[in-house]
Amino acid sequence: MDLQFLGTSSGVPTKARNVSATAVIEATGHGWYLVDCGEGTQHQLLRSPLSMRDLRAIFITHVHGDHCFGLPGLLASAGMSGRKAPLPLIMPTALHDWVRQGLAASDTYLPFELQLQALETFDGFTCGNIQVGKVELSHRVPSYGFVFDEQDPEPRLDTARLQADGVPAGPLWGQLARGMTVEHEGRQLDPQHYLQPQRPPQRIIVCGDNDRPELLAELAKGVDVLVHESTFTEPVVERAQATFGHSTAAAVARFAEAAQVPNLVLTHFSARYQGAGAARGSSIEDVREEALAHYRGNLVLAQDLQRYHLARDGRLVEVL
């Protein structure tokens, strides 16, 4: 799977960072899922190769505006782009009427079915070989993370088993490879009996705002990539004597190290953290240095519009 970050700033945008939005992209490179939709997300999409027609579902982690204010515009643009397929939108119940009323008040017509689902009672979503679950987090308001699990990735035909079962090479093999049930000599052949994954399935967790990384302990077992907010560094929290429901780079890094997370992506940075080499104020390098002091795995500080690929060897790498 791939990740592309459409917004990595906390609270407000900066000149270099938009507010929260993350795309999780299927291994095929086409279908994708949007986690959060801060204001301006549709503008970021114009600067990416992602198509609204290939969007499988939208997931909103919590009600705060920097995670959802981009929804009405994005939905309207999806309709104007010619999308016809139904679009599942999983988000807190408190936002449902806001979206409905916003579309109605602006006389916005959607040529597709908007399938609103309550996040509080959400019990999973499946599309093709991707399953999405949720995990409850800790913030000033109810907040969740989403777990993306692959099932049977990149299956290949078990030709030895086919031959042993007397199924000759030919069109039947092609149909089974495409996941079709076929009939041979009066028998129904289930494609799942003849398909094997070429690599281990991948798991990616994308979190909303959270001040208790340890809540992820169980789900982090076997995770390939953890995407977690890192709004502040410890000196900022110490001066303020409050976390405001957010995590520091050190807190997330300590958890990821203890949980043996192989790839840690930090995002949702306070606007105070400017680019490397900033003339004044805090630098994003402060976040990196604090995390590296506690974490020995592959650390990534998310950048707007940067795409990352989870390779076969399990390492998350930039797509150049």
From Swiss-Prot:
Cofactor note: Binds 2 Zn(2+) ions.
Keyword Hydrolase: yes
Cofactor entry: Zn(2+)
Short name of any one Pfam family annotated for the protein: Lactamase_B_2
Residues annotated as transmembrane: none
UniProt KW Cell membrane keyword: no
Active-site residues, Swiss-Prot/TrEMBL: 66 (proton acceptor)
Reaction equation(s) it catalyzes: Endonucleolytic cleavage of RNA, removing extra 3' nucleotides from tRNA precursor, generating 3' termini of tRNAs. A 3'-hydroxy group is left at the tRNA terminus and a 5'-phosphoryl group is left at the trailer molecule
CDD domains: RNaseZ_ZiPD-like_MBL-fold
Leader sequence residues: none
EC number(s) reported in the record: 3.1.26.11
Binding site for Zn(2+) 1: 62, 64, 139, 209
Keywords: Endonuclease, Hydrolase, Metal-binding, Nuclease, tRNA processing, Zinc
Binding residues annotated for Zn(2+) 2, in chain numbering: 66-67, 209, 268
GO molecular-function terms, A-Z: 3'-tRNA processing endoribonuclease activity; zinc ion binding
Subunit structure: Homodimer.
HAMAP family: RNase_Z_BN (MF_01818)
Family: Belongs to the RNase Z family.
NCBIfam families: PRK00055.1-3
Name the record gives this protein: Ribonuclease Z
Protein's organism: Pseudomonas entomophila (strain L48)
Originating gene: rnz
